């Protein structure tokens, strides 16, 4: 039985180290990105997204966020390039968000918090399966995309509409024919650094690529996220808001930029 971690005062990020001591590790995420301190690296490649909408399969409320899950049994939906060696398979995406505008993202840029942050998660095919990839420093590649309230994002509406069927913890629904490329901003410039999962078990297995350019979603779309519940159907209602981890110490790491 895993420890019931969450985002509340009694089980939130300040307590995670009690059950997951790696929370105080050397390469934890998220971090505060400083544009001045990031080093431009001309050797970094463009990110190459090659997704097949046919691999989308389900949307799940796991009591911490919602995951859109993909069939990762073949190389139909993959990420390559960036700071990566080899091929990384798409497994899921999820979002972290706030209770109000001005907070919700996990990474920050020059002290600025965005309203939400989308994480697209991939695992290194050389490790054979996701669970094995978690044990390696180059096991996962996560692309982080900042979200801010502004114009509606038509490409995310299908996701927003599906939330009605997974309002409470433990619910899941079929979610098919979806290509997450539509969620990316036009500019694919990024910062990259070695880090971790931002939720327990907090494994230090992630090569992060945080895109410089945010996407916008409407306030209505944002409100639908805040309408989800941390709680199960048979429990008192607990709204799913502020499911983000604060920035962690950079320690000896370097942040590199793909752009000048």
From Swiss-Prot:
It catalyses: hydrogencarbonate + H(+) = CO2 + H2O; urea = cyanamide + H2O. Pfam families: Carb_anhydrase. Zn(2+) binds at residues 94, 96, 119. One of its GO terms (biological process) is regulation of intracellular pH. It comes from the Eukaryota. Its cofactor is Zn(2+). Residues 3-259 form the Alpha-carbonic anhydrase domain. Its main location: cytoplasm. GO terms for molecular function: carbonate dehydratase activity; cyanamide hydratase activity; zinc ion binding. The record marks 7, 62, 67 as: Fine-tunes the proton-transfer properties of H-64. Inhibited by acetazolamide. Substrate binds at residues 198-199. GO terms for cellular component: apical part of cell; cytoplasm; plasma membrane. Catalyzes the reversible hydration of carbon dioxide. Can also hydrate cyanamide to urea. Belongs to the alpha-carbonic anhydrase family. This is Carbonic anhydrase 2.
